[in-house]
Amino acid sequence: MITASTSVFGGLILAFIFSLLYKNKKTRIPAEIDRVRTGGFLAHIRAFGCRLGTRVDDIRNGYNKFNKNGKPFVIQDSTFIPQVVIPPQYLGWLKEQPEKALSAETVRLEQLGLRYLVPSSDPEMVHLLTDVVCRYLTRNFQRVQERLYEELHMSTDEIMGLEATEWRQICLHEAMETILRRMISCVLIGLPWCRDEECLKSWTGFLHCMAIAGTILGAVTPWFLRPLLGLLLKPPVGYMRRRSLRYLTPIFTERWKKIEKHEKSSLTTRELPDDFVTWCIQEVRNGAAEVTMLDLLSADPTIGYWEKLVEEATTAFRTDEDWIHAGTVSKLAYTDSAIRESLRRNPFSIRNVTREVIGKDGLTLPSGTRLPQGTWITTALANIHHDARFYSNPTEYQPFRFVARDAFHTEGKEGSEKVLQPSEAILTSTIDERLLTFGYGRRACPGRWFASHILKMLIAYITINYDIQPLTGPPKKVKFADFTVPSPSIKIIVRRKNLAYLRQRER
């Protein structure tokens, strides 16, 4: 029988063990670096016991108090991993550090839980896939553009409807996820698998399972408990992985055989499937769509943001011929700016550009402070995106902030002209020290060009072909640990534009 005294005694033993683990961990951050919370080990205990939202407040307070003055600070959270948040001024220095000094790979293995959920994962495979994306996908937009448009056209019409006489309610999260999943799949695995619902469900189910388990392990669980919790989470992840491989393995096998025939000159290049699987063998999401749509639909409808995007899209895409030319997407400057602004206002995580000091001798910060091996370095992503030093009126939604024009003129509610001053012409896919959604430096997201490309296609197609009722209030969000995403239950009301309008557009 477990008594109160037994529980207290057991708790004291656990606290003692955790304290020993904490003290024996090789990494001890120098005392001269400022702390948001004081108390060492007890600060981590409080972070673990308090609601997870407190880390948002800690990082915001540390950014305002220290980072804005050019000083790094220490953040203590439930993971018990020593982390130093560097100011924006240090990003140039971080970018120049070699991989042997600062590693993004070791952080990725911990943050995604891969070390415990998929211990057989090969780091070389990650480098390989990155190379495939950089060398093939970003250079072959035109070769996949027609397929992208076909999937966009078919999936959007199927989900949002073709009926122009009545409004219908749809779940925004499900709609965006399904459309983007099919567009991405047509490049990843090609036809007919990209339209096979069971195939799509198998690998997206595996990704969802990995995301949930990885978040629990990497963002919440103390580092010394991860091996134990990983043993409990590994079986369901392994099951979903095997389920997805039942579909994907035959696809890779088929491509491998065709490539072998091609290398023996019995198969022409035109006959060779042109998709991501083929590129992988030869070389061997984000919710961005949702937050962009939600920002546009919750903005003041009298300002005319949506109408401007409709005008831009209808000018660029007059016929189906325009859709199958990848270069047409580059004309969507206002759409690109709207996506970038939503990524600025709604970062997926409060931290990014995280690296681990792996050199045996540690690493010296620009301030002269030396960090020991094992320290994590990160940036206050959300706070940088809302810093008035980098953005005028940072809390205000300005979807055309990044358009290369002197000003965007609109009519306010009272009829007076309102002028929104954009910063400068910067594409969504551009890596910039003020916008870190896609990372920074050599380890920035290699698929950002493709992501930006399909997002602009999706928003353009919807604005051209559908009317959507504005939202009545700010959209709900779900927060957990470092992450914030739109509520998956948000509904929008849509209606297909009538044929007369669409025919008039094509003239």
Curated annotation (Swiss-Prot):
It is found in: Membrane. Glycans are attached at N352. Its main location: membrane. GO terms for biological process: secondary metabolic process. It is an enzyme of class 1 (oxidoreductase). One of its GO terms (cellular component) is membrane. Belongs to the cytochrome P450 family. PANTHER family: CYTOCHROME P450, P450, PUTATIVE (EUROFUNG)-RELATED. This is Cytochrome P450 monooxygenase nodZ. It comes from Hypoxylon pulicicidum.
